[in-house]
Amino acid sequence: MLGTDPTPEPRPKVGGTVARSAAGVAGAAGRRLYRHLANRAVHAGWEWLERSGAIGPDSPRARRFGAIGRGSCLAFPPGAQFGERWIRIGEDTLVGPYVSLSAGMVPGQQMVTDPVVRIGDRCMIGRGSHIVGHFNIDIGDDVHTGPYVYITDQNHGYEDQDEVVHTQWPHDVPVVIGDGSWLGTGVVVLPGAVLGRNVVVGAGSVVRGTFPDHCVIAGVPARIVRHYEPGAGWLAGPGVGHGA
């Protein structure tokens, strides 16, 4: 009938909407709490693994090494490790995580020199570095390296043109890194390299040859860019009597 009140519109079901909204909030809060607890558990577990997995002089795994000095630590997780019998580490030295230390080509190989790899006192070997010894690598005291440094005393030969390189007999030449030296990130030290005391090696350099005490070297191949002269201080270039 004309003039009668129209049919009232249905009222929204406020109670159901509120309930669903509250459930959503509670669910989001629960997920946040779960992520928070999981995050704490993962990091606490990883820190426990780092503490428990580190190798010190009193660790059971230290018995595999030729020596690990008092106060030294090989951080967890390690890189590849074999030939530990032929590796000696001095006192108060820190070997970072993911560092590979090896002596010989395969585990269990009998070596002709002992130690094959020696790392001195108060050294720090940066994360992800590789020290790959076959004859003799001698790293002095107070040597620090940045991450991802590669040091080896062996290269493959390539003289025989009828043989592929990787099947040719390798050449071993000792490596010496003098006390107090610093090797920047990504340095490669090749067989036969000899660094004097307190040598600074620029990041990314490839080192071969012999370098005197108290110099800065950089480049591919590395060359002396600064040197110290008593009475004159630090000077640019290699100086008189210093090779490039």
Residue locations for each model-derived region?
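Flexible glycine-rich beta->alpha loop in the catalytic core of nucleotide-sugar glycosyltransferases
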Residues: 149, 156, 205-206, 212
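Short coil-to-beta microelement around the adenine-binding A-loop and adjacent beta1/P-loop entry
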Residues: 174-175, 193
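Conserved hydrophobic/aromatic beta-strand scaffold that supports enzyme active sites
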Residues: 206-208, 216, 224
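Domain-scale signature associated with acetyltransferase and cell-envelope carbohydrate enzymes
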Residues: 1-152, 178-180, 187, 197, ...
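A generic "structured core" feature
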Residues: 182, 196-206, 214
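Histidine/lysine/aspartate-rich catalytic loop segments that bind and position anionic ligands
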Residues: 140-162, 167, 172
